[in-house]
Amino acid sequence: MMKSRDKKDLILESIIQTYLLDNAPIGSNELNSNLCIPASTIRVYLKRLSDEGLITQLHISSGRIPTILTMQNYWQNFWEKEQDKNIHIKNESFLKELSKEFEIYCLVYGGRSLVLKEVLDLNTKFIVLDFEDEELVLKYEKEAWNFLQSLIGLDLSSIEKIALRVHFIDLVEKIASLRQNLICYRSNEERAYQIYQNDEFVKLLDCQIHRHFKESLEFEPLFKEGFMGLKVDAQFLGEDVNIILAGSVYTDYKKILQYIKEAA
């Protein structure tokens, strides 16, 4: 016999999956058809789920949809299992189609594999940070020179975090400028604006968004209520990159990632 917890979880999962698939509320009769649980029993669990703030109704006469909190928990659980899996993208047009079909904003930028190889002193006038494929140039200061020596062997993201922590503003700005030059692809900027509905949306348009991601999955306060963003490690046209995917919590990111993997 199915336990009440199992039934409740099963009903909630069915509501989530149906909404992701059809973007439409689901009622007790449809759940009964999908799950073979009596409609009267389903109504009891719908009341419990509603009381717990896990589902809601857009209108009194309509079916149920998952709440924003439910979707946040759903994507958190999903991403814990998926975030370390490899993603390969072989053409830009495929990303453009995905952005349009799923109404997501997409930003692809390089620099993931950049590691500080050497710190050079140019006549005590400039300091050159050599990342092998890229370089940064700073004004020479003895204190900065000594500090930067300790960063040799670290990747660009780690150096950026340290620079932010110690308020090394010149270095932070140089890294931001470098990241701008490393943008490989961007699509659906209109969606970026829709997420914020104000001038805040510009932070999604450049690589400074990278440092706002404390984790690879972010909700509020980085994104407005009801929206989210994923920062994905990937290969894009053979280059190590990060990809930002941003959109509604009701967007099917599971399907998006599946499409990407199938196209690889």
UniProtKB/Swiss-Prot annotation:
Record gene name: hrcA
Stated name of the protein: Heat-inducible transcription repressor HrcA
A GO BP entry: negative regulation of DNA-templated transcription
GO molecular function, one term: DNA binding
Alphabetical list of InterPro entries matching this protein: HrcA (IPR002571), WH-like_DNA-bd_sf (IPR036388), WH_DNA-bd_sf (IPR036390)
Source organism, top-level taxon: Bacteria
Record keywords: Repressor, Stress response, Transcription, Transcription regulation
Role, per record: Negative regulator of class I heat shock genes (grpE-dnaK-dnaJ and groELS operons). Prevents heat-shock induction of these operons.
Species for this entry: Campylobacter jejuni subsp. jejuni serotype O:2 (strain ATCC 700819 / NCTC 11168)
